[in-house]
């Protein structure tokens, strides 16, 4: 939990305290923007690839070609974050190596498996729009997001906006 201006506010501490009282650890951090960008980078790399493989990260990233694509998407995501003033650091390959050890199914894959509406716009469409607005090429992510969107549409779990 954090404030957009990077401060540790009493408000954030109070909200965190209430959440923690319910049993969920809730750290208050200074650089919430970096944390949000890091989360988005995880979503754009793992979500589409796991939708396409219909499997968790460990199985998906075991294939060298898919692993290489994930690294490229992570690098594209880092470039997008930098374009918006947030340096999430480098080390896309290291992040993907860590992800490749976890048998985690991203929530968007869980939605597909359970027949629930999928968050295509928030997790895929908006980052692509932001990339276009910032002039950041994301060809690998554009491909994986397009295929994942088609999979969601074909499953009846996403309806692209009209227009």
Where are these regions (language model features)?
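Internal alpha-helical scaffold of NAD(P)-dependent oxidoreductase catalytic cores
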Residues: 1-88
């Amino acid at each position: 939990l954090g404030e957009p201006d990077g401060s540790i506010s009493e408000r954030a501490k109070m909200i965190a305290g209430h959440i923690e009282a319910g049993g969920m650890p809730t750290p208050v951090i200074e650089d919430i923007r970096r944390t949000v960008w890091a989360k988005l980078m995880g979503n754009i790399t793992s979500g589409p690839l796991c939708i396409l493989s219909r499997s968790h990260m460990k199985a998906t990233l075991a294939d060298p070609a898919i692993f290489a694509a994930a690294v490229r998407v992570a690098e594209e995501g880092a470039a997008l974050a930098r374009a918006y003033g947030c340096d999430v650091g480098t080390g896309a390959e290291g992040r993907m190596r860590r992800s490749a050890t976890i048998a985690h199914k991203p929530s968007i894959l869980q939605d597909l498996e359970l027949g629930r509406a999928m968050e295509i716009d928030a997790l895929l469409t908006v980052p692509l729009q932001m990339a276009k607005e910032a002039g950041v090429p994301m060809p690998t992510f554009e491909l994986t997001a397009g295929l994942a969107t088609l999979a969601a549409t074909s499953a009846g779990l996403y309806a692209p906006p009209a227009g």
